[in-house]
């Protein structure tokens, strides 16, 4: 193993992975995180795409601006960030007209190890969506939940 490979070695993937952190029912404020799934992602989704954190997501939601959850239905685990709109990655290009090209839109998925939002951004770029109007929340559900920020039941 060369020096570069030793930093990429990860825990073996479990048979049934849990992509969204789980609240530990009897321990308020504690979540369990499964580190055995996913891919290592870059900090920037693509050239011209701004990467944002939780404060920007909160401000976007407070201002009534769009925050899009691109997670496939089977990867949502029944929860989402309140105020977000679900447009699964499989539908993102078909539903491009639901996006407001005049306002910055934040896209997110399950977190730093989840490729869904980066892939969705690349699909939208290829479809002609303006890079300067797409922001990438790399932390996704993983960071949102591990910071103790509120989530709601996902009925979409």
Regions of interest found by a model, annotated:
Residues 1-75:
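Flexible, polar/low-complexity N-terminal or interdomain linker segments that lie immediately upstream
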Residues 66, 71-88, 97-99:
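Mid-length scaffold segments of soluble, non-membrane domains
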Residues 85-87, 135-137, 152:
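General small-molecule cofactor/ligand-binding pocket signal
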Residues 53, 89-96:
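Alpha-helical scaffolding within the catalytic cores
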């Amino acid at each position: 193993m060369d020096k570069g490979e030793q930093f990429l070695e990860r825990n073996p993937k479990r048979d049934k992975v849990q992509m969204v952190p789980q609240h530990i029912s009897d321990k308020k404020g504690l979540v369990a995180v499964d580190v055995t799934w996913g891919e290592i992602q870059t900090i920037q989704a693509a050239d011209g795409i701004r990467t944002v954190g939780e404060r920007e997501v909160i401000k976007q939601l407070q201002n009534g601006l769009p925050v899009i959850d691109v997670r496939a239905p089977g990867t949502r685990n029944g929860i989402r960030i309140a105020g977000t709109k679900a447009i699964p990655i499989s539908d993102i290009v078909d539903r491009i007209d639901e996006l407001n090209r005049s306002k910055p839109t934040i896209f997110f998925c399950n977190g730093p190890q989840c490729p869904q939002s980066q892939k969705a951004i690349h699909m939208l770029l290829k479809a002609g969506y303006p890079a300067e109007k797409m922001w990438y929340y790399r932390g996704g559900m993983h960071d949102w939940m591990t910071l103790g920020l509120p989530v709601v039941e996902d009925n979409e």
